[in-house]
């Protein structure tokens, strides 16, 4: 009897859903299932009609949006012309990850579960709705749900006679194993020249994650006051000859690197020679090694460019890490962090102080020394690319991309300040230096009106103003007035980004600007207050002239408060009832006249 096939599909923005899909995959192997795991947008969705057992793991981002790597799938699965029985052969389960402090908690998982059922698929269980706000995190829901899932699945597909579930004490082989060679790399290989020749874009097709463009840094300017608590940079990349095309609302992806100091510390802890050549090999011949892994040639490149040693380790890290421990005390502690009962302890140790993988390795020296190199790719996740809204227009500034970036740094109970991997690295790069930044462009969610006479209202506090600078530059370059910007920050003299630029455009009749400086007076003033103060203008632009409204910035409170202010304007100036104002904004959203791009 052949093994039962199981497909695990995930949509992940920060890596949590992908990590959970990996956990499911390992559990499937322990239950003797033939398991495939793919990101939703990497899976050929037309094949879904042939699948019989599928588990979906998906996060909800921003204001109820799907993760970037499931957006194409999301559009496809909600096509109106799909037959109502298209998935009648499928048994499925949906595992969602969200944050209950947001209004659209686990919106994607709930909607996907309902849609699959509408298309004839049979749910194995109610959708699981993991919550970041729970004191134990998503695992509070995930752990009992997985027990119920495997109980249900095994009742439908029992183990073959003579087979038993593989114990957690048994170490499964890694998906990709790392082999160290005695041969050393040369200086040109260590600097990455050979690696980059294989890895970079060929300049005839647009760069991508597989083939990024290595962009020189043209400028790196601090645009917040030097005595301001937050270091914000305007960074400009040279994209001459890259074949990159972008439009207002698009995002540039940046692949960051670990610092050489952290690379050296990691290699020292594991007794690795950075100069050793490496080969990455698949455990399964049918799972070829990804190109970016196959191109790696040295330990230093592996650690600097691939292993996310400065990320916060997840539970899965400790579940594997404890297998290598020869020390009884360390092993017991690692097992505690690995089990369901130890999650509160793990949260206090890792999540609350934001302790990194590298710092955990320091804390468990006996175990760290015994990590087999072959398991490094299984133990430590890949460095994820970071997304930045493009803050410039190709029309105004050809051959360049600019980003507005806050350098992440904060204190916890740990002595060493916490620093953002990507922002710290980018902020350290000097203009016209030798270091190149791997970048590529992805289409953004914002779409601006084609009609030059359509007014545009933009609400972008802080670094949320970045995509609107690109839009305003482009519209001005094409002679389009009717640009209205609501910008908010802490202080006029502290973090008023692009002040002179906005002033010049206002004087030329291209921009109407409203500012909210929250800390320049006793009572805090935010962009939503300015919206209410200018209700007549807003109603004229939105209600009379059918303008477009855009919101960008932090997803926590601002988007909802701005939306409430807009509803207030519709009621006051448009004479609408509260339900009518709600419906009006909903219809604007449906016709793309009301758009938002927010991030956590």
Swiss-Prot record:
One cellular component term from this protein's GO annotations in UniProt: perinuclear region of cytoplasm
EC number(s) from the headed UniProt entry: 1.18.1.-
Record-level Gene Ontology MF annotations: electron transfer activity; flavin adenine dinucleotide binding; FMN binding; NADP binding; NADPH-hemoprotein reductase activity; NADPH-iron-sulfur [2Fe-2S] protein oxidoreductase activity; oxidoreductase activity; oxidoreductase activity, acting on NAD(P)H, heme protein as acceptor
Cofactor dependency: FAD; FMN
Reactions performed catalytically: 2 oxidized [2Fe-2S]-[protein] + NADPH = 2 reduced [2Fe-2S]-[protein] + NADP(+) + H(+)
Cleavable signal peptide: none
Pfam families found in the cross-reference section: FAD_binding_1 (PF00667), Flavodoxin_1 (PF00258), NAD_binding_1 (PF00175)
HAMAP family according to UniProt: NDOR1
Function text: NADPH-dependent reductase which is a central component of the cytosolic iron-sulfur (Fe-S) protein assembly (CIA) machinery. Transfers electrons from NADPH via its FAD and FMN prosthetic groups to the [2Fe-2S] cluster of ciapin1, another key component of the CIA machinery. In turn, this reduced cluster provides electrons for assembly of cytosolic iron-sulfur cluster proteins. It can also reduce the [2Fe-2S] cluster of cisd1 and activate this protein implicated in Fe/S cluster repair.
Name by which UniProt lists this protein: NADPH-dependent diflavin oxidoreductase 1
